[in-house]
Amino acid sequence: MVSKQQTMGFQTEVKQMLHLVVHSLYSNKEIFLRELISNASDALDKLRFLALSNGSLFENDSDLKISIQINEKLQTITISDNGIGLSWEEAVENLGTIAKSGTKEFISQLTGEQAKDSQLIGQFGVGFYSAFIVADKVTVKSRRAGLQPEDGIVWESKGDGEFTIGYEKKSTRGTEITLHLKPENDEFLSDWRIRGIISKYSDHICWPIVMKKLSEEGKESKEFETVNKATALWTLQKSEIGEEDYKQLYKHISHDYMDPLTWSHNHVEGKHEYITLLYIPAHAPFDLWQHEAKHGLKLYVKRVFIMDEATQFLPRYLRFIKGIVDASDLPLNISREILQDNKQVESIRAACTKRVLSMLEKMATNDKETYQKFWNEFGLVLKEGPIEDFANKEAIAKLLRFSTTASGSEKQEVSLEEYVSRMKEGQDKIYYITASSYNAAKNSPHLEIFRKKGIEVLLLSDKVDEWLVGYMNEFTGKKLQSISKGKVELGDDETSEQIKEQEKTLEPLIKHIKSVLNERVKDVLLTNRLTDSPACVVADEQDMGLEMQRILQAAGQQIPVSKPIFEINPEHALIKRLHDIQDDNQFELWVTMLFEQAVLAEGGQLDNPADFVNRVNRLLVSS
């Protein structure tokens, strides 16, 4: 008998979600069973974990399982588990409300592709609502483990914006979800249909899924039988597991709709015994760049589920990796805090990191096309590697890909090994330029002398690149050198001598330019790096790069004031023209315009763009 029954309205976001789920996934209805079984599996995991420290939660029933029963007469399917169960408050919170941000993300991710969208509901933790794809009414009976039978609850909704909830005595813990099927969905009253769906989506669930046995005539008996493999797949040897099994397990733990690119499954024995199963996804998750987004591996200890998103087993730059760690020697009551300072965890972390990098190296060597797909999805994250993982810096460096002046494309496809193999005779540095965009890098005046001499330059336009080159300053003994900082020395003694001679001849001009620019520059020098442009700005060798300064300023950070060096091309017609200008005001106009032009060409911003436009207009009129 139901007592203290209340009618409540769904949160606005839940109404939206219900509408979206039911109407966007109607042609892929069978996924409701996958989602409800997955939720039941989670409930069993949670109970077993909590029972490690409080055995009374088992209530003398430690035979954990998921049960599915069909009632053709009542047109219902009931999915029940003897897991952790729900209290009144948890039922209202979990079945009546969801995070607003989650709704917005869900809506933005919908594509109209049934296969893809069906996976999103699991990814966003709203799989329960898939029940309304096939049912016009859903009844949930539940009691949280440890509460009294009188604390059982019954929750019911027709998916129309409201739900009722009340207390109802329930002698057993756990949750029982009854779907009252819509008439057009009677196909799901077929025992064989349900078994087929379980085999397709949930065979790898490590808890037994039981249904009533069928006689040879196809009639139900009172006995139950397990209809899935009910094995912790990762505990088996590789030879016992099919490729499709690996893929299905990946989809279960990741809520991904695509197959993984590759995986690595290892049983480690010795001082520490553990199993790892690591997957490299085929595409980036929607929240890859959200700082608060959950990531990490599933942790088991002796086959007992301990926690999701155990971040301690991989560095942050590998946060896209999905998988499982099953350790034999960790304590069952281990907490996230204990994981931080555990020697065995450090050992497993080091091994997992090397395993992932090894998988990537193998892919990059043996299957360049697949590796390029990986890089297009995750390359930006991998570039964080040398910054935070000094021990594996060299291994990560081999995996990096870049755009270059030789590739002629914005696609990042060139490895550092390829670059080094193409270096000119006598070249001892790897040259690069950083900019705010690929086009800004590709068209930088700093490239002029390198193009003339046929020297390849890395074009770096990702924000992380500035930090990357700060931490990775050499590769296989070759120093990485910015072409927009300090002097450029390309081993051309004749040009250097010519510059020295010109410096003597043009000393009065250089002094005059310095007096005009005054505090805006650190120095004015003749350059050998330009062939087509009249001037450029560069950072001093010891100063922060100009692009890094812009990034930090945009982030609102205080940075030390550093002025650029203004370099002029003595062979350019505009610089030669400066010789002939006698009027100081005209000279100042020309010099200021050339300087600001160089700042813009470098990707910088002017304090007063209107002044620049006005100056250019005045010079056009007077020329």
Swiss-Prot record:
Signal peptide: none annotated. Keywords: ATP-binding, Chaperone, Cytoplasm, Nucleotide-binding, Stress response. One of its GO terms (cellular component) is cytoplasm. Residues 337-550 are annotated as: B. Transmembrane segments: none annotated. Residues 551-623 are annotated as: C. The keyword Transcription does not apply. It is found in: Cytoplasm. One of its GO terms (molecular function) is unfolded protein binding. Residues 1-336 are annotated as: A. Its main location: cytoplasm. Pfam families: HATPase_c_3, HSP90. It comes from the Bacteria. Homodimer. Belongs to the heat shock protein 90 family. Molecular chaperone. Has ATPase activity. PANTHER family: HEAT SHOCK PROTEIN 90 FAMILY MEMBER (PTHR11528). This is Chaperone protein HtpG.
